[in-house]
A protein has these predicted regions:
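Glycine/Thr-rich phosphate-binding loops that ligate phosphate moieties of nucleotide
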Residues: 14-15, 46-314
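Short coil/turn segments at beta-strand junctions that form active-site/ligand-binding loops
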Residues: 9, 32, 203
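Conserved active-site beta-strand element of glycosyltransferases/polysaccharide synthases
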Residues: 36
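Structural signature of cysteine-dependent C-C bond-forming condensing enzymes
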Residues: 4-10, 228-231
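Conserved phosphate-binding catalytic cores of ATP/NTP-utilizing and phosphoryl-transfer enzymes
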Residues: 2-6, 17-33
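Short beta-strand scaffold segments in enzyme catalytic cores
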Residues: 22-26, 42-46, 144
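Structural motif corresponding to the C-terminal cap of alpha-helices
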Residues: 5-9, 25, 188, 192, ...
């Protein structure tokens, strides 16, 4: 190969890997700690010692492969089809007048209109988060499903759609945003629950990625919903850091991935702890979420079956 690409023979070339897997390593993943890469979607990575996984096959997740994340470990992968994209979708709905009408204003010039639009759009999610955090947590508020891009895990079904119920004339933008935020956190809990149901303990959560770094509101809510602490990794580019750790092992600087993580890891700069009172309410809300999800899935699956039969007989 060295002759083919004209490199000197002493150059060591490592094989590639998935970005989220390298991100989990860069984020200092530990056995049975769920590394949650949170951006537009999520990629949830968990590793377990190979000898402890004999005879275990987790149903309804994205993948389970020996050595796929760390040598000597079984890598398990799950994820949510829409996470940050859910918040961005709602922001874009609210921003429609700014994107489509502001440039036609006769009060301000075009350059000012563009600057004002960009400034206002940039403030939407931070201000929604601030106002939503002031709302009391209760059992009867608006409820949403986070399936705006289908469901990846557990039990992938890309036909599923998002839903929101409990709307009234008193429902405003912060309340709708709060419902969407809850839905994404409930989606995270459904993944944790699946691992636990399949005999895989989840001892903690490691948060990496854009949403983990930028949204204390979402991270605190997730800690409350999951009922466990969430550690946020200090380094912003954990995928690149993980790639560097693997390169250090390939080049012989460190003998194992674990030793590379210990030497090159940047640690954690924030930790969110669950509020027990809110957790109790969220458990009841989670039951409502699951019931709504079952209803939505039954309606969509029913329509899909009718369409499928019609297509076959046509």
């Amino acid at each position: 190969m060295g002759r083919t690409i004209r490199t000197i023979h002493q150059v060591v070339i490592g094989t590639g890997a998935f970005d989220a897997h390298m991100g989990a390593v860069g984020g200092e993943i530990e056995p049975y700690h769920l590394s949650k890469v949170m951006g537009t979607s999520t990629c949830d990575i968990l590793v377990a010692p190979t000898e402890e996984m004999k005879g275990k096959l987790v149903r309804g997740i994205c993948g389970q492969v020996n050595g796929s994340v760390i040598p000597g470990m079984v890598g398990l992968e799950a994820g949510q089809s829409a996470f940050g994209d859910t918040y961005a979708w709602f922001r874009n709905i609210l921003a429609w007048p700014m994107n489509n009408l502001l440039a036609r204003s006769k009060i301000i010039d075009a350059q000012t209109a563009v600057a004002l639009r960009d400034e206002m759009i940039g403030l939407i999610i931070p201000e929604l988060s601030k106002q939503a955090a002031l709302l009391p947590v209760d059992e009867s508020s608006e409820l949403a499903m986070d399936w705006l891009n289908g469901r990846r895990t557990p039990d992938a079904n890309q036909m599923l759609k998002g839903t929101m119920i409990g709307l009234s004339l008193g429902t405003d933008a912060p309340r709708m945003f709060r419902a969407l935020a809850e839905a994404t956190c409930f989606g995270a809990k459904s993944i944790v629950d699946r691992f636990v149901q399949e005999g895989i303990p989840v001892k903690g959560i490691i948060g990496i990625g854009g949403v983990a770094k930028k949204s204390p509101y979402i991270m605190q809510m997730m800690a409350d919903v999951l009922g466990m602490p969430i550690r946020i990794h200090q380094f912003e580019h954990t995928c690149a850091l993980g790639a560097a750790m693997f390169a250090a092992v390939v080049s012989g600087i460190y003998p194992t991935v674990g030793e590379a993580m210990a030497a090159m890891g940047r640690g954690f700069d924030a930790e969110y702890y669950p509020d027990k009172e809110k957790q109790a309410i969220y458990l009841k809300r989670y039951d409502q979420y699951r019931a709504l999800g079952s209803f939505v899935a039954s309606q969509i699956d029913g329509k899909s079956s009718v369409h499928h039969k019609t297509t076959i007989t046509a």
